[in-house]
Amino acid sequence: MERTLQVPYSTLTHDELSPLDLELEQRALEAAKKAYAPYSHFHVGAAVLLANGEIVTGSNQENAAYPSGTCAERTALFWASAQWPDVPIDKLLIVAINDGGRVPFISPCGSCRQVIMETATRFHPFPILLCGGEQTIYIDDCRLLLPFGFDGSAL
């Protein structure tokens, strides 16, 4: 039996972002500028809003021995968990820039999606914003990015 999977999302203009989302975007852009990306020249920044109001950022860190580097999303999520292990994530925002400036928007890689899903399972689902220069993709439940993800129930 064939089935169809749909992912609900919204598109927002920059003017439709809340003041908090604009702050997260600015922090993610600042993080992206700190990325170490000498090979791809693709700089990604992530900003994580914690339930305690803290904002944690991360950037991608490349390595000549690919895939030994890490993505911005995992950098931010792991740092948040290491510093505040019992504080839930309330929101994740991702941006990217390259040599030409802002890119339209990017979606997390498979490894990042798995970490995002594990984080949501650990606490609660949270929204994810994929911010481009002109448009932001808003997904209310981050787990929708990995509908058939692996979890601890299989262990």
What are these regions (language model features)?
Residues 37-40:
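Short loop/turn motifs at secondary-structure junctions and domain boundaries
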